[in-house]
Amino acid sequence: LEEGHRLVRCMEPSAAWGARWVSATSPMAKRYMEVATKKQSLVCLAADRNTMAGLFELMEAVGPHVAALKTHVDLVDDWSAEAWATFCEAAHKADLLIFEDRKFADIGKISRSQMAGIYDIRSWSDLVTAHLISGPDIVDGLQAGWDDVGRTGGVLLLAQMSSRGNLLHPDYTREVVEKGTAHDGVFGFIGNGSRPNELEALRTAVGDAKMIWTPGVNLAVGDGEMGQRYGDPTEAVLAGSDCIIVGSGIHKADDPGAAAAAYAAASWKGLLQRNG
């Protein structure tokens, strides 16, 4: 299969993902692995643009090289329901999962209502993030939100964070993993891509049935702005990450498309080495 100037060898998801493909319990996890295999990319772009034009421009540039877009719908200054619907339709046509990083934290009943509301997150998101601080009912509430509109989605629970001084301590992480791995509505967990040792421990605790997605990675390893730390993308995948979440490393690059392709190559290399 010829894609631009790059020769892409077709591979079945089962061959690329090994045990993760066999053990995955979430339909959305299978969908993600299919898209990632097709694009040979374990990259989710943190699409932190605050205008609709900026989001469309970014999606067009990086779409072939990323498997998902992480959005913050409430950051968009000129948001409208019509423009957002057009954006989401284009994203899905480009084989991009839409991951709304809402970080829900309330009780299940309220979270279900928040999936509706002015942004109607339930109608376009494939994945959302949540804290488990209010208990497992939050996952039931979020899944009920998707059920209300006849859609399927997955919840990513925050088990670790990559920012300095965060309060997600090991005991909390352990409880999140214990409760999350037992819940069918949980797609997976957010881990810390900047610390491979912590990520390896998280993968051991999680097992193969759930995804681990990780921010905190950059081809330029080190400290970033506002307390962020960065680890190497390939190392993160080798340590157990199933998707690297990349923001400024792509959208602030002179050529976002080329940057996305570089991250895709680094992530795919890690997956093949991990399962090789």
Tell what function each PLM region has.
Residues 41-47, 69-71, 98-102, 128-130, ...:
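Hydrophobic faces of well-ordered beta-strands that scaffold small-molecule active sites
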Residues 83-102, 202-218, 267-273:
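Alpha-helix-loop-beta-strand connector modules within alpha/beta enzyme cores
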Residues 112, 225, 255-259:
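Histidine/acidic-residue-rich catalytic or RNA/ligand-binding cores of hydrolases
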Residues 126-134, 233-259:
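Glycine-rich phosphate-binding active-site loops on the catalytic face of alpha/beta enzymes
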